[in-house]
Design a protein with these regions (language model features):
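Preference for well-ordered, secondary-structure-rich cores of eukaryotic proteins
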Residues: 1-2, 40, 61
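Local sequence-structure signature of Cys/Sec-based thiol-disulfide redox active-site neighborhoods
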Residues: 1-26
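Thiol-based oxidoreductase modules, predominantly thioredoxin-like and allied folds used
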Residues: 5-7, 25, 29-42
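Short alpha-helical
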Residues: 12, 39, 72-75
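Chalcogenol-based redox active-site neighborhoods
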Residues: 19, 46-47
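Structural micro-motif
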Residues: 47-57
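Non-catalytic, surface beta->alpha helical segment in thiol-disulfide oxidoreductase systems
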Residues: 58-86
Length: 86
């Protein structure tokens, strides 16, 4: 599984989710590619991301299988990861 994570330094929800994601990575082996909404503008545009951050785009076998927008609980993300499968 691979996750593209898009956030911004001005986004308070992103700061919260960074901590949540770090906890998840302690439990799961997930390749994570991080983009900054402002600094990586060209890359971010490829993912059709709106104004609500953070965005987590889950890939399995190089296909997008799920997208999470905004703050979610750790348990919600774990449920998604378990459903997709590593």
């Amino acid at each position: 599984m691979k996750v593209v994570k898009i956030n911004a330094i001005w986004c308070s929800g992103c700061l919260v989710m960074n901590k949540v994601w770090k906890n998840i990575l302690k439990r799961y082996d997930i390749e994570t590619i991080n983009f900054d909404y402002d600094l990586d503008e060209v890359e971010v545009k490829k993912y059709n991301v709106g104004d609500i951050l953070p965005v987590f785009i889950f890939y399995k076998n190089n296909e997008e299988v799920f997208r999470v927008v905004g703050e979610k609980s750790e348990s919600e993300l774990v449920k998604i990861i378990e459903e997709i499968g590593e």
